[in-house]
Amino acid sequence: MSQQNLAKLISLAFTEDRVFNDKTSDLCLAKNSQTSFAIKTREPIIFCGKEIILEVFKQLKQTKKFKNSSINIEFFGNDKDSFKSGETIAQGKGCARLIFASERIILNFIQHLSGISTTTNQFVRALNNPKISILDTRKTLPGYRFLQKYAVICGGGKNHRHNLSSQILIKDNHLASSEKNINELISSSKKKYQNLKTEIECDQYFQVLEALKSNPDIIMLDNMNRKNLIKSIKEIRRANSKIIIEISGGINLENIKNYRDLDIDYISIGSLTHSIRAVDIGLDILHP
């Protein structure tokens, strides 16, 4: 996780939420008021966001308003750990105004990211085949990609390419817009970008046959019906066993078990990041 990018994102959240002008807390709480709190799960989760909690408190304490404020926190687990419903992730004590200023920002981050890690882990367990990796995609929120991809790792998944420069991925729209055919595009890519992997997206069996002429590093079988999917996998393995096979499109928690026994390497799932449900985590004030 990039600490520099995280610091910038948290700073943006402070500005957005006007944390230094919390009129309600200033009205209700004395400046030196202290309180204890606990961050608890309200459903089973795979946790992601420990560094975010620490960074939020750290940045607030460095500001003029809270520079003399105290905050102490103890964690009862780390990123990637599982928590049952009702369990405490962290507990602490400190300046009440600081805690209320940070509450919603912390929860927004960790509910979303723990939602990604929890769902990713559900896919990994439903697939139940360690030889096949669950991958994310670039279908992420602007500015949040590094966090969302980190959350996928916390859930037991792996990252696909991080940006447009990190790997060649020739998709259907490229094929529709280019004057070159599949074979020519793969050959050009391997010659020009020898330090990058070249991947080709195929949604038809004839495209697989064309792609195999140039031996791409990865072939993505996208939205293929079962018959063509199995036929394509067999042909790829017959032609070149070193080619990585990725499948994608329409795969969910209900049907992923249908792909468990296929001779493939990756399953990429856009819903891990683009339509995730935030998990239920709360920050509760503890009374003596």
Q: Model-derived features: where do they sit?
A:
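Conserved, well-ordered active-site substructure
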Residues: 268, 280-285
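Short acidic, glycine/proline-enriched helix-loop-strand junctions
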Residues: 238-244, 287-288
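Short amphipathic alpha-helical segments
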Residues: 219, 285-288
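Cys/His-rich Zn2+-binding cysteine-cluster or related metal-binding knuckle/ribbon modules and their
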Residues: 253
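Acidic/glycine-rich phosphate/pyrophosphate-binding loops and surrounding catalytic core
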Residues: 1-203, 207-209, 213-214, 218, ...
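Short glycine/threonine-rich catalytic loop with a Thr-x-Gly-x-Asp
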Residues: 247-248, 285
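Short secondary-structure boundary segments
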Residues: 223, 249, 271
